[in-house]
């Protein structure tokens, strides 16, 4: 079976917890919305931090709202550029992942773990998941079209009331397919 869905390309970014927000931006500081992104209630903020490793540094935009735990999401290319061995993980699975120094306008901290390469995944409204016989935790494929059409395997389904229909891949994967955010791709699966 297959069905079309919009693609969202995720560039490197950071999610901060309240404690780290206070250290990096000042006590009780708030994020300021730069622009909404594809998932309900989420946004790219005006705020940025600098991640520093022994090898290099890079700027990271903060995605809001704040989360229970700080998580940095990089592409494999980004991780290699700064010399990190960041594991490919599902969002939230940060145990024993990479760490680095984070610097903000009000302070800095040493993040012990929390840096990952986010595994590709598809967000689905509950109604969409039900319509196609899928559930949270299922694994599907993404099929892309065009000159550099590819099939990407092992795509995690994340279905629930806090999700909107959208596939998320990182910049490395999007560049391999020569695709940008907003194009349609197909979810392919066997039921």
Question: Where are the model-predicted features located?
Answer:
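Extreme N-terminal starter segment of soluble prokaryotic enzymes
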Residues: 2-4
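Short beta-strand-centered segments at strand-helix junctions
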Residues: 6-8, 13-53, 60-105, 110-137, ...
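Short coil-to-beta-strand transition motifs
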Residues: 149-151
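RNA-contacting regions in translation and RNA-metabolism proteins
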Residues: 186
